[in-house]
Amino acid sequence: VAQTRVTQSALAGIQASDTLRVGAYFNAAPFTWLNERGEVDGYEADIINAIAIELGLTVEFVQVTRQNDDEMLLSGAVDVLIGQQARSHDREAIFDFSHPYYVNEHRMVIRQGEPYGSLEQLAGHAIAVEIGSRSERALRRWSEARGVPFEIVTYLSERAALDALAAHEVDGMVGLLDSLRRAGRQQMSLVNEPVMVEPYAIVLRRADNNFRRLLDRSLQRLKASGRLEQIYAEWFGAEPMDFVTLVPVYDDLYEDTRGVDDFAREVPLPAYPVRERLASGQPLRVAGIAAEGQDAPAVVRLMNGLNRALVEEMARRWNTTVEYVPDSVTDPAALVASGAADLAVGVYPRWSGADEFDYSLPYLMHGDRLLVPANSRLSGFQDMLGTNWIIGYFADDPDGEEQVMKYAEHFNVGQNLRTFQITRESDAIYTMTVEDNISAIFGDSLRLQALMRESDPST
């Protein structure tokens, strides 16, 4: 693929024409295809149409193929690509991607009853793939990365590869999970371990950051309104998909009232190019690690350990070292925006900062939880029948008591319980399990997990 430096955003043409030109495969059902009425249809087509409605644009679908799609995008013939467009490390060197909205898997199929519980157990066996497919590349990469050899046998189609498995010509077959499900083959089963996970997203030209933010804002609004899940259910029914992780909804999302014409057409170079710094041998500067004094809460120690392990593994893979920026907990993202840090951990994404820096996908989710003794019959507020339930909350949580009562009223058990203020975090579990003065502890799940780990390191 010939890569050229783009100096103007796709927004220039979109703003001039009020039209979004979408490159799409016309034969990739149920994601994008041309239906019997001559209309582009499918899950991704519906997402694009919903985005266009949200932005006040008209959609023009342009047919592309797997041979010319990349060139069509890079040349400016289309503004975006859709249709099982896989977000991969290789492609990220050339393109940018929106939030992913579907996760597929390349999976190994075996005959039902065969004794293969993992991919490694099929080492040396004949495995069928469709020739030239992404599944063939995924299997070869998995094999090379792990040093596990397969006899890879290619067929002209997925159907022919499945037929070969049924006829005992091979012992396994690798294909895309959604396609394998639609094939509906009897007497076959899946090996639990995926060969490769493949997220699908909207593809746009690299470094077109303003356009990408506009697309991501629309996807987040579709997620926040429930429309994204509705579109998904229309095509895939009850098949699970983790949209909470795939399309995170940032704080203050709806406070951004800008329209399409308000986004800049230019594609600016980054003010502080991190890759160049790392390539020159300088360390990765990380903000957001808290100081661990004697009185530091347990959750600080837990999160510091997790965040250090995360960034140090990243640095190892990037062949660089880590430098932790001191006194950087108050606003670590601002240090990234100013160039004083390369990366910030433990950041809550907010849309008002999206023009200054990029966020990764979430790597940790947390929320309100109840911690109860191991032998308790409580699984939640709904079990607090009768009276004399005492729920502890932390004194330094300004909304703790109010939140306890809100949950209690929601489950119609407000009259059955009373609250207890925990002034010393270190006493919380002892008060519940030894003194038996409270029935449960209410708090943030990370804080409760940290207390559990320090009380019993085996948890």
Predicted regions and their residues:
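Ligand-binding clefts/hinges and TM-proximal coupling segments of bilobed small-molecule sensing domains
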Residues: 4-5, 134-153, 187-190, 220-267, ...
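Flexible hinge/capping segments at coil-to-helix
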Residues: 99, 110-127, 361, 372-391
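Periplasmic-binding protein-like
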Residues: 26, 101-110, 177, 181-219, ...
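Short helix-initiation/N-cap motifs at beta->coil->alpha
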Residues: 7, 60-71, 114, 151-164, ...
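Ligand-binding cleft/hinge of the Venus flytrap
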Residues: 33-35, 48-58, 135-154, 185, ...
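Beta->alpha turn/N-cap motifs
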Residues: 23-29, 62-67, 76-88, 112, ...
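A ligand-binding cleft/hinge motif common to bilobed small-molecule-binding domains
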Residues: 68-71, 84-94, 138-143, 162-196, ...
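N-terminal hydrophobic or amphipathic helices and topogenic motifs
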Residues: 1-64, 224-330, 337-340, 377-383, ...
